Amino acid sequence: HGNLYLDEYFWIPKFQELRKVASGMAIHKKWRQTYFSTPSSLTHSAYPFWSGALFNRGRNKADKVDIDLSHSNLAPGLLCADGQYRQIVTVEDAVRSGCNLFDLDQLRMEYSPDEYQNLLMCEFVDDLASVFPLSELQACMVDSWE
């Protein structure tokens, strides 16, 4: 048992299954669960966990929460109504806060505008209209443990 730190969880296939099992390692109240990631797709299995939709499943209407996931709301960090602390930190936020490790002009040249928004500005990809949505591609993946 101990603290659980899960990095890049928006890129883990079958995230809900992993979370259900791994969270048991930090089930005692003295341990912490910390999840952090660059966003992937709105259809990723981790999105309901991030958005609060997972918390709302099976709850009465009066007990459901509505979480404002906007950058302006979450940039300073916020303990939300579902008990999760959420924070969005973009590369531009980091630079404004004094981090001098990034060359934003170089990053804008290196990444396409869509990649920059997704990977560095914490915007989710809406792949619902894609020819191959992420959820369908993940269904084609092979798990070497199976």
Predicted stretch roles:
Residues L79-E146:
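ATPase catalytic-site recognition across NTP-hydrolyzing enzymes
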Residues N3, P13-L107:
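ASCE P-loop NTPase helicase motor core
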Residues D7-Y9:
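Walker B catalytic acidic pair
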